[in-house]
Amino acid sequence: MEVIAWVVASGSVTESMSAGIVRLLFKKGDRQDVKNYRPVTLINADYKLISGCVAARLSAVLPDLIHMDQTGVPGRRVSDGIHMVSDTIEYCEREGVCGAIVSLDQEKCFDRVDHEFMFKVLGKYGFGPVFIGLVRSFYAGATSRVLVNGKFSDEIQLGRGVRQGDPPSSLLFVLTAEVLAS
């Protein structure tokens, strides 16, 4: 609890908390193709406790902030989105309504989140300066090193994106994307 209080009071995390180790997890296909790996960031345990508190806060309010058609929110199921599309197709066929279905996939979407935009979105949705400052501290000076075959890369400064494997990352992404969808 002292660490959390210190981070909130100081508005910053320690250097060891902001440093991540990226492991590449093989998905499928050709092991020589880097696209067949998913990066996951391993993060300091103290940091994960603090970011877990942020994730819990976000999880509690996201269902009220995110449109009901968005299924990337705790308590909602992907199958709900599938049923909605199926019902829409059925309605259009039954009523003779012309339509089109567009499926968009944002490649490397977690890597493309602009931090300043994300902080503004948090403010737009009513998160206070202490909460936004805490999230901001997660990204100020954040670095990662990639671990491959037992060897570390040089340190990489994280100028944008949310970290794979960080508890609030998917929630911050969904909240940021909601502004673009509405």
PLM regions: where:
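Conserved pre-catalytic core of RNA-dependent polymerases
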Residues: 1-182
